Design a protein with these regions (language model features):
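Hydrophobic alpha-helical segments of integral membrane proteins
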Residues: 1-9, 57, 61-65, 241-248
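Membrane-embedded alpha-helical segments of integral membrane proteins
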Residues: 1-30
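Membrane-interface helix-boundary motifs at transmembrane edges
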Residues: 30-39
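Transmembrane helix-loop junctions in multipass membrane proteins, especially transporters and channels
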Residues: 35, 64-71, 254-262
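A structural signal for short, hydrophobic/glycine-enriched beta-strand patches
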Residues: 51-234
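Extracytoplasmic/luminal low-complexity segments enriched in Pro/Gly and acidic/polar residues
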Residues: 218, 224-228, 233-266
Length: 266
């Protein structure tokens, strides 16, 4: 039920539909002869896209999320494994129909996972995730990654797949059941930088200790490359709404250890 509700909520949080919601309210206000409400909604429907396109606002929220955890400097202490969270694969249906494993704009999760596997070849590399779609079709995320690794001739006994999780918290719970991490163990966690706060909160809530966040797939730089862009602004707001709402809901439902997890001093 939680998974279904979260996917339904994501439709409401899509920034592209917000002006249309406001225009619908304006239409209803006109029917009810609420002229002030009608004018306010029309004004917001016009102004909101301009507000979203103002990058210091839209990308500023995303930058806050992406800066919560720095890229770690891996020291000489042993590593017990690497976990790569799903969300980097493309359409499972297209992958199945075309016979080619699809990746999306978050493919850095996969490539960094493979890079870390080269750096630490003697520890498990775990790809976590089944599908984040409400109505899944075609290959699962695990199947897509497995096929890609086969194409690259990288099949290896130390590459494992957690094949059942549908969201971040299930990633944490199911990976823990699969790997049975011991107290004091150190696992590198790879996911998109904006997704890392919710991921760390979920793993800690699921009982993980010693997780080393390794953020990738940055959507913002250290400064704004321009002041205004509809495309970049709406993309940033999509991530902002998704992650901040997810952080709040996860915290309220006990699926995160903190409202906005961040790096801790060792």
């Amino acid at each position: 039920m939680f998974f279904v509700l979260s996917k339904t909520l994501s439709l409401v949080l899509e920034p592209l539909v917000h002006p249309f919601f406001l225009l619908l309210i304006a239409l209803l206000a006109r029917w009810r002869q609420r002229r002030r409400l009608q004018i306010s909604c029309i004004t917001l429907a016009i102004g909101l896209p301009l507000f979203y396109g103002f990058l210091p606002f839209s990308q500023g929220g995303l930058m806050l999320l992406e800066n919560r955890f720095p890229i770690p400097k891996l020291d000489e202490r042993p590593i017990d494994g690497v976990i790569v969270l799903g969300g980097h694969t493309g359409s499972g249906l297209i992958s199945q129909q075309r016979g080619q494993p699809q990746q999306n704009g978050s493919a850095e999760r996969l490539t960094m996972g493979l890079k870390l596997h080269q750096q630490f070849p003697d520890v498990p590399l775990v790809f976590a995730g089944f599908s984040g779609n409400l109505f899944h079709q075609g290959w699962s995320e695990a199947k897509i990654v497995r096929e890609l690794l086969f194409d690259l001739n990288m099949s290896h006994a130390r590459i494992l797949f957690e094949k059942t999780s549908r969201n971040t918290y299930e990633n944490a719970v199911n990976s823990r059941q699969l790997l049975l991490p011991q107290p004091g163990s150190r696992w590198i966690l790879v996911t998109s930088a904006a997704h890392m706060p919710r991921s760390v909160g979920s793993f800690e809530a699921a009982g993980w200790t010693g997780v080393i966040p390794y953020p990738v797939d940055y959507k913002t730089g250290t400064e704004f490359e321009r002041l205004f862009s509809f495309q970049l602004g709406f993309e940033a707001m999509r991530g902002v709404f998704h992650e901040f709402t997810g952080l709040l809901v996860y915290r309220l439902t006990g699926r995160s250890s903190d409202l906005l997890p961040g790096a801790k001093d060792e």
